Structures are given as C-alpha cells and as structure tokens.
Amino acid sequence: MYLEHLSLTDFRSYAQVDLVLSPGVTVLVGYNGIGKTNLMEAIGYLATLSSHRVSSDGPLLRFGTERALVRARLVRNGQTTVLELEINAGRANRGRINRSNPVRARDLLGICQTVLFAPEDLALVKGDPSNRRRFLDELLASLVPHHAATRSDYDRVLKQRNALLKSARAGRVTAAHEATLDVWDQHMAKAGAELLHARLELVELLRPHLARAYAELTDASKPADAIYRSTLQNQMDDDGASLGATGRPGPGDAAAAEDLRGLSIEELTQRYVRAFGESRKKELERGISLVGPHRDDLELVLGQAPAKGYASHGETWSMCLSLRLASYYVMLDDARTGGSAPILILDDVFAELDVQRRRKLAAIVSGAEQVLVTAAVDADIPEELSGRRVKVVPGGIDEQGE
C-alpha cells in the first residue's frame, strides 16, 4: 500500500498543509523543529490511533483549536480509499471512510498500516514494560482490528475491578465485596485470556523475524530473542519487574512459557480465575490488580542476557530497529495471505546510527512499496535510499525546493 496524498488541518504546528506522495522512497528534509515529525506522526496516528510521541491527544491539536483533521488518500491492492480522522478536544474522535457518514475512530484501524521507526523507540528496550505491551497491542490492532476492542474491554473491566479493590481496602471487607469481586474476576479472566492468547501468538510470529533482523543489521554472534513474561507464571514481581527461571529478576528461556502457548482461551480463563483467588488477599491489601496482562512484559534478550541494562548503546539501537523490522516482516507475511505491505516511516533515525547500521538498514527497507524518511540534512541519508526529496519549511512544504 502507499499514500498518494496527506492533508492536515490544525494538527500540531500546521494550520493547513498538503503533501503529495508516491510509491518508492520520499525523503523530507528540513532543519530540526520545522515540522517533519508532525507529518510522520499524523500518518502513524491514522494507522494506530495513537502517537509515538505523546500519550494523550491534546498536544496533537494546534494551540487554541478544538479539533484537528487528518485526511489521506491511500492506494491498497489497486483500490483507492479516502480516510479522514477528526481528533476532538474533550469528546470522542470520529472517522470517515470514502466520505461516508461518521464512524468510530477505531473503525479505521487496519486500513492504513505503517511501521514507524523513531528515536523514541529506545524506550522499547530501555523503558518500562508498558512500552513493550503497547508495541504488541498496536501491532495486533493493525493485523486484527478487533483486537482494539478486546484491549478496550479489558481496560474497562480492570478499571472497575481496581475501583472495587480500592473501595474494599478503604474499609472492612464484607461478604458483599467478596461476592462482587467474584463476578468481576470472571469478567477480567475472560477478557485477560483473550488478550494474553493474542499476544502469545504474536510473539511466536515475531521471534524468528527478530533473530533474522538482528543478524542482518549487525552480523553479530549474539542471537536476539523475545520472551513473553506473564503474571500467570509468576514471571513478574509485584512491582512489575521480569523474573527469570530462577525467580529472580533476569533472563530465562522461552520454554518457561511453553505451557501458556499451548493453552486455549478457555484454559487461560480458568488459570486467571485461580490466580485471582490466590492473590486476592494481597490485592485487597494493596488496592490494585496484581495479576493480568496489564502487568506482563516482553523481555528482549541478547545472547543470555536481557537487553535492558546489559546491551551497549549500539546494541540497544540494533534491537529497537530489529523489533520494528520484525513487525514489518510479520505484516509482509500477512500481506501474502490477503493483506497489504505496510508503509515504512523512518523519522530522524539515520542521524542516530553509525555508518554501518545506516547502510544495512537502508538496504533492508529500500525495497518496500513506500518508504517515508525525514532528516535534517541530506548527508544523513544513505546512498542506498535514493528517491524523491521534499523540502519542509515553516508552516508547510516548499514545492519549488523538491
């Protein structure tokens, strides 16, 4: 798939901007702070309904405005689709598909698919588990759009259950509290099992591609791997740190999750119900849910050591890039069975890499149907990514500068 046209109204720094795009490589060049990333962020938001830079929608609206509009014309498998996303302050966002009546924003998920590489990706290795959970859930929503509803259902149940635990913690725990918790345990077990099952399947798809991508980028002897750490297996401590096979924070092996990978959603549901019962006393004492996919982690491993805390800066960057490439390869596999190859976005990434990693990454992505790259100067772009150049200037695009 590829974008033919992007239009933004009151998005970030832009009152109005239009960008004509084409298949192949397009490099947007402009000094730092000029607005290149805002353009890439808008495309990424259209694909995932979330920003790679901020956790809330407020900063996406141009200061002093009440809504922002992102419009795009997308060509997918030869068919043209016009997407429009209205981002509103204080109320639900809305979408339109081919100028239809308004639909829920999440109805747009899965239509425009992107893989976005950015400096913020360092948080995938160095950050807390929420960054890695978000990575998995966003990729799942792109591949299977109804996963967004699954995650939303789980978050809703989790919020209700936590409110009940806090209420019970504030006073004496009564039989009514216990009975109500039993009901919410069932709801959360079912929603959590669906979420966990989907994540486990996705991690198994990612693992071989992660190893391949890391080897392509580095020629390193250390193999790269990813291990899903679940609270169902006592793989996380009460503060959210990963536990290895020894029960101490640290790496383990993928076999530790073998029994979970072989379980059905119904079996996982029963596992959660039992786990909630075993942890109830501690949860009532703390007033929060200690078991569930909201506390799980995706541990990234280099050789025998976790990448977090042990990888060098260069290895950390290689792992981040490899994880994004792995998601790209998974999407390509999906495209071969009826999907469509995603748009690749590389936002100010090459400036962060040494020459060797620049050239290897460029060689890998150059064959994608559409590659959008941003850079402060042309010198940051490897020769392997020859293509159209677009000059970004204050407030818009310099058509004469292309």
From Swiss-Prot:
Please report a single Pfam family linked to this protein: SMC_N
Output the PROSITE patterns linked to this UniProt entry: RECF_1, RECF_2
Molecular function (GO) terms for this protein are: ATP binding; ATP hydrolysis activity; single-stranded DNA binding
Q: Which GO terms describe its biological process?
A: DNA replication; DNA synthesis involved in DNA repair; double-strand break repair; SOS response
Residues that coordinate or bind ATP: G30, Y31, N32, G33, I34, G35, K36, T37
Location in the cell:
Cytoplasm
Q: Which UniProt keywords apply?
A: ATP-binding, Cytoplasm, DNA damage, DNA repair, DNA replication, DNA-binding, Nucleotide-binding, SOS response
What InterPro entries does this protein's entry cite?
Answer: AAA+_ATPase, DNA-binding_RecF, DNA-binding_RecF_CS, P-loop_NTPase, RecF/RecN/SMC_N, RecF_2
Annotated GO CC locations? cytoplasm
Q: What is its main location?
A: cytoplasm
What does the UniProt record say this protein does? The RecF protein is involved in DNA metabolism; it is required for DNA replication and normal SOS inducibility. RecF binds preferentially to single-stranded, linear DNA. It also seems to bind ATP.
Family classification: Belongs to the RecF family.
Q: In its UniProt entry, what is this protein called?
A: DNA replication and repair protein RecF
What is the organism of origin for this protein? Pseudarthrobacter chlorophenolicus (strain ATCC 700700 / DSM 12829 / CIP 107037 / JCM 12360 / KCTC 9906 / NCIMB 13794 / A6)
Q: What lineage does UniProt assign to this protein's organism?
A: Bacteria, Bacillati, Actinomycetota, Actinomycetes, Micrococcales
> What is the name of the gene encoding this protein?
recF
